[in-house]
A protein has these predicted regions:
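Glycine-rich, N-terminal phosphate-binding loop of Rossmann-like dinucleotide-binding domains
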Residues: 72-73, 154
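C-terminal helix-rich "cap/oligomerization" subdomain common to oxidoreductases
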Residues: 3, 8, 28, 68-70, ...
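Conserved SAM-binding strand-loop segment of SAM-dependent methyltransferases
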Residues: 50-57
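NAD(P)-dinucleotide binding in Rossmann-like oxidoreductases
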Residues: 207, 222-296
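N-terminal Rossmann-like dinucleotide-binding module
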Residues: 1-48, 72, 184
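Rossmann-like NAD(P)H-binding beta-loop-alpha module
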Residues: 130-158
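Beta-strand-loop-alpha-helix segment that lines the small-molecule cofactor/substrate pocket
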Residues: 68, 75, 80-127, 142
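Rossmann-like dinucleotide-binding domain that binds NAD(P)(H)
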Residues: 160-244, 316
Length: 349
């Protein structure tokens, strides 16, 4: 086993989780971190004991000993330029979703990674949720037969929605439904999406942030299978969890339902009322264990670099997801279905 040197750029919520996972991994020889907020940099450095803790990520890219970079920066427009700089420095890349803001950016990154023989994967962490993985297996092993339809409903609270929607002008399709588009396309592969229709609502977030409250998306696959995804970020602040998800996958021989609303564990206190403490999409540390998919996803990336394996999520798959949610945004804007051509360029139906 080759031990690797890893850099984490951006150590906020998700980046902090990844830095801690790297620090604890037997695959990692050296950890290096970069964070522009001094207090957060100091906090994460105290937990992870990195070799380097810098406010300037370029310091890490100049270090030839670093093999791989995990990019967990916000706002999202930073993804493309930092990923490009990292690839030009010869680093393998883990990049949080979205892969980019424009398709040409995604295509350039994919081509650059291929030309330099670099691993390049995107953070679609829900593939590492055991409940979601069971849905995938139930299709692959024939338990529910051939897929007929799917429904995914994902909604987060307004407090979290304002934090996300307020930092970048991307819709719930791009920021929330993207996880579920990736998940369903992964389950239904090798089927391809051919048509997208979407409707959005603007009653709460639009005035302040100019983003929709929620979006409902219908995607038709090339074999006629249809799936629907609803995603929003306006659950009331008093709702007792961060993220609430429900999945229905119906096949010719059966169906599988997933309740990922996190109601299986709840805490009631005099001060805060009812709370679902294990309810964030990335997950959270609970004493000596980790509840949620992000730690497993991070470990998977480290394994891929150390053991020279292909990542579960490919950049090409992330580009396909991007084409679908961009088509959803276009459909919501025009009120018309959008056809996806063979090369996945959105056009009005």
């Amino acid at each position: 086993m080759k031990k690797i040197n890893v850099a984490v750029i951006g150590t906020g919520w998700c980046g902090g989780i990844r830095a801690e996972a790297c620090a604890a991994s037997p695959f990692v020889n050296e950890l290096h971190i970069a964070e522009i907020k001094p207090d957060r940099l100091k906090e994460v450095a105290a937990k992870t004991k990195p070799v380097t803790a810098s406010a300037d990520y370029r310091t890490l890219l100049q270090n030839e000993a670093i093999d791989a970079v995990m990019i967990s920066t916000t706002p999202e427009p930073t993804h493309y330029p930092i990923a490009k700089e990292s690839m030009l420095a010869g680093k393998h890349i883990f990049l949080e979703k979205p892969i980019a803001l424009e398709l040409w950016e995604a295509e350039e990154l994919i081509a650059l990674a291929r030309s330099k023989n670099l691993r390049f994967t995107i953070g679609y962490s829900q593939r590492f949720n055991p409940k979601f993985a069971l849905v995938k297996r139930s299709i692959d092993d024939g338990t529910i037969g051939q897929p007929v339809s799917a429904l995914v409903s994902r909604h987060i609270t307004r407090n979290l929605g304002k934090k996300i929607g307020g930092r970048v002008k991307l819709s719930p399709a791009a920021m929330e439904a993207t996880h579920d588009i990736d998940f369903v396309l992964w389950c239904l592969a090798p089927r391809k999406p051919v048509k997208v229709y979407a409707q959005e609502v603007r009653k709460i977030m639009g005035a302040q942030y100019n983003v929709p409250d929620c979006v409902w998306i219908i995607v038709t696959m090339d074999d006629g299978t249809v799936f629907t995804i609803g995603a929003g970020w306006v659950l009331p602040p008093s709702y007792p969890n961060f993220s609430s998800t429900w999945i229905e996958m119906v096949g010719t021989e059966g169906a599988i339902m997933v309740d990922d609303t996190h109601r299986d564990v709840y805490v009631t206190t005099m001060q805060k009322g009812i709370q679902f403490p294990i309810s964030t999409m990335p997950g959270e540390k609970v004493a000596h264990v980790y509840a949620g998919p992000m730690e497993a996803e991070t470990i998977h990336f480290l394994e891929c670099i150390a053991l020279d394996r292909e990542p579960l999520v490919t950049a090409e798959q992330a580009k396909m997801v991007m084409r679908v949610y961009q088509a959803a945004d276009l459909s919501a804007e025009t009120g018309q279905p959008v056809e996806l051509a063979a090369e996945y360029v959105p056009s009005l139906a």
